[in-house]
C-alpha cells in the first residue's frame, strides 16, 4: 500500500483537542470497570506501529500541511524572534518568520553526510526536524497528561518513542 492516506497532523490543535476528549472519555469509562480497577498503567500510542512514527514516512511528504506549517512558524518565532536572526541562521536574505515553509521532501532527503547535517548550509532542514520531533514529544506529553488527569487514581503512562536518530535511515520517521 504505497498510496498516501490522509492522516491528522500531530501539530493540529483540533486533532489534539478532539482526540484528547476521546482519550479522556475512554479513560473515565474504562476506570469504571473491574478491568480498569486492575490497571497499573496505560501506553499512549499513535502513528505507525503505535510508536509515534509519522504516517506515510516512507516516500511521502510527512506533516507538511497547514497545521505543521503554522506550528513550524511558531517554533521559528520562539527560536529566532526576528526575521533578521532567521535570515542569518538560514543564510537566506528572503526568509521571514511569517512566510517560512516546511522544507520539501527533496530538501529533507538531501544531505552531505548521511544522518549528519551541516548547520551552515542545512539549518532550515535541521530546524524543521527539531520542530517536528518536539511536536511529537509534545503530543505524547499532552495525551499522557490527559490519561493521568482522567484516571481516578495514580497511573503509570508511557509510550514507545525515542529511537536512534537514523532509525530506518529516515530522519523524518518521527
Task: Kindly give the residue locations of the regions a language model identified.
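Polysaccharide-binding and catalytic clefts of secreted carbohydrate-active enzymes
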Residues: 1-174
Amino acid at each position: 500500500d504505497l498510496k498516501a492516506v490522509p492522516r491528522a497532523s500531530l501539530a493540529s490543535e483540533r486533532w489534539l483537542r478532539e482526540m484528547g476528549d476521546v482519550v479522556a472519555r475512554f479513560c473515565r469509562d474504562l476506570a469504571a470497570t473491574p478491568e480498569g480497577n486492575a490497571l497499573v498503567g496505560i501506553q499512549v500510542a499513535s502513528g505507525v506501529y503505535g510508536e509515534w512514527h509519522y504516517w506515510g514516512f516512507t516516500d511521502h511528504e510527512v506533516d507538511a500541511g497547514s497545521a505543521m506549517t503554522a506550528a513550524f512558524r511558531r517554533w521559528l518565532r520562539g527560536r529566532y524572534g526576528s526575521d533578521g536572526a532567521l535570515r542569518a541562521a538560514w543564510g537566506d536574505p528572503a526568509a521571514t518568520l511569517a512566510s517560512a515553509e516546511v522544507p520539501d521532501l527533496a530538501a529533507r532527503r538531501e544531505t552531505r553526510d548521511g544522518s549528519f547535517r551541516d548547520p551552515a548550509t542545512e539549518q532550515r532542514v535541521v530546524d524543521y526536524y527539531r520542530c517536528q520531533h518536539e511536536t511529537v514529544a509534545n503530543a505524547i506529553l499532552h495525551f499522557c497528561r490527559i490519561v493521568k488527569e482522567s484516571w481516578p487514581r495514580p497511573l503509570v503512562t508511557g509510550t514507545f518513542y525515542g529511537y536512534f536518530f537514523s532509525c530506518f535511515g529516515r530522519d523524518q520517521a518521527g
